[in-house]
A protein has these predicted regions:
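Short acidic, Pro/Gly- and aromatic-enriched capping/linker segments at domain boundaries
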Residues: 334-343
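Cleft-lining beta-strand/loop regions that shape enzyme active-site pockets
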Residues: 26-39, 48-60, 113-116, 121-130, ...
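Conserved functional hotspot residues or short segments at active or partner-binding sites
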Residues: 349-445
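Terminal targeting/pro-maturation regions of precursor/exported proteins
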Residues: 2-79, 112, 227, 400-445
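Extended, small/polar residue-biased N-terminal targeting/export presequences
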Residues: 54-115, 159-163, 167-178, 184-188, ...
Length: 445
């Protein structure tokens, strides 16, 4: 009987304790909802006052779209509202052709910052560089505008001229750049062979990226007479602003036999996802160097991070941009769309790239060309590479055959080409030299 009474008392006490604990979340939820409705009433009140009392008549649709966009852009630099026209433009861009200047931009502290100019576009040809801040478009200031509003100012008819004012860290004063708008046709991948190295220049991640990559590698291997005549691959991701996650996964998978490529984690555990490599390596086990710089962002960082973590590639260059978030495009009423950050992505080792970027295994800066350098400077450098054979009256090597002399001439031509490449693109030259070195110490097949 005593045991029963004790049990009953405990049950009663637990009931007293548990009931408030169950009630608290419900009360908190009701309080939060009440506060939300209160804030929505405030929004409605302000909206009505603007319509009634603003100095000029306002467009209700534009006002609401601006409010929606303000709500989204307050979250992070990559979330935004896309009007029906903007949503249509974005779908065109992922297919590989659109009109404009050819730059990828973001917003930093209220200013428009260039992530990178896209290869062979008006912006790239006009001299726009990664890290440039655009302060004015045709004399109109951009400070205070949303990113979409600033981008809208830069749009215009193909063939029309635009003047952007740029602030660059290496320049003491802002300066203007004139650009002629054009149709931007993105070539996702360019392929070539330099010496015994296949160079794959990946400039964006759109629907054409992986098919172009696969076709280019196959073509270059066949042209070389087989993979045995190739010492390695350079995957050039410099100034690549990113693009489709699905294409970044396919490009990474192209060089990995197994293991995780990338994972994403959202707010809730069930929002996460993971992608793994499948058997097959387009490079057939040959060494790979990945080139990155501050203009390499998003999908580029997924590829660089995956190949680096699996020790499948040596990453060379400078630290990447550091965009480690995933945006989901969600259709909304009225044919518009919402670009919302829904997850962060992580490399196979669990690294988050967000705001940190991918650090290269070997840091190699791209030297800035000195505009004040003269032809005499170049001649002096070339003179430093002279050999005994270049001296007047030097003795001939009497043991050389015609084949030896032909080989010497070929080596001289290759050396001249290498010197030219070092002057034009030091980072790429370094990557190719690195693969030559790796090839030299590998055991004979």
């Amino acid at each position: 009987m005593k045991k029963f009474l004790i049990a009953a008392m405990l049950g009663g006490l637990l009931g007293v304790v548990v009931a408030p604990q169950l009630a608290r979340p419900l009360l908190a939820k009701e309080t939060n909802q009440a506060e939300t409705y209160k804030q929505l009433e405030l929004f409605g009140d302000i909206f009505d006052r603007i319509r009634a009392q603003y100095v000029e008549e306002v467009d209700d649709k534009k006002l609401i779209e601006a409010a929606i966009n303000g709500m989204l852009t307050s979250l992070d630099p990559h979330s935004s509202y896309l009007s029906p026209d903007d949503a249509s433009d974005m779908r065109i861009q992922t297919r590989g052709a659109f009109g404009g200047l050819g730059i990828e931009v973001t917003q930093e502290d209220g200013f428009v910052k260039v992530i990178t100019p896209i290869d062979d576009t008006p912006a790239a040809e006009a001299g726009v560089e990664p890290g440039d801040f655009i302060t004015h478009v045709d004399g109109e200031g951009l400070l205070g505008l949303t990113l979409d509003e600033a981008v809208q100012l830069m749009r215009g008819p193909v063939g029309s001229e635009i003047v952007i004012t740029v602030v660059r860290e290496s320049e003491p004063e802002p300066f203007d750049i004139k650009i002629i708008r054009d149709t931007i046709k993105l070539t996702a991948v360019r392929d070539k062979t330099i010496g015994e190295t296949i160079v794959m220049r990946v400039s964006t991640f759109n629907d054409q990226t992986y098919p172009n990559l696969e076709d280019g590698i196959t073509k270059q291997i066949e042209a070389a007479g087989g993979i045995e005549n190739i010492n390695g691959f350079v995957v050039d991701l410099r100034n690549n602003p990113g693009g489709l996650l699905s294409q970044a996964i396919k490009v990474s998978d192209a060089f990995l036999e197994k293991g995780e490529i990338v994972s994403t984690r959202g707010r809730a555990p069930e929002d996460g996802d993971r992608w793994n490599a499948r058997t097959g390596d387009l490079a057939q086990g040959k060494p790979i160097v990945v080139l990155i710089n501050g203009g390499s962002a998003s999908a580029s960082e997924i590829v660089a991070g995956a190949l680096q973590d699996h020790r499948r590639a040596i990453v060379v260059g400078t630290k990447s941009f550091g965009k480690g978030s995933v945006q989901t495009i969600m259709p909304v009423a009225g044919d518009g769309a919402m670009r919302l950050t829904t997850a962060r992505y992580y490399t196979p080792s669990g690294r988050s790239i967000q705001a940190l970027g991918v650090s290269p295994d070997i840091i190699v800066e791209q030297p800035r060309k000195d505009p004040n350098s003269t032809k005499e400077d170049t001649v002096e450098v070339e003179g430093a590479t002279r050999t005994e054979a270049d001296l007047r009256g030097s003795l001939d090597n009497d043991s050389l055959s015609d084949a030896d002399r032909e080989q010497i001439e070929q080596e001289r031509a290759r050396a001249e080409e290498a010197a030219k490449l070092r002057d034009e693109d030091f980072q790429l030259s370094y990557a190719i030299d690195l693969l030559k070195g790796l090839s030299a110490i590998q055991p004979a097949q």
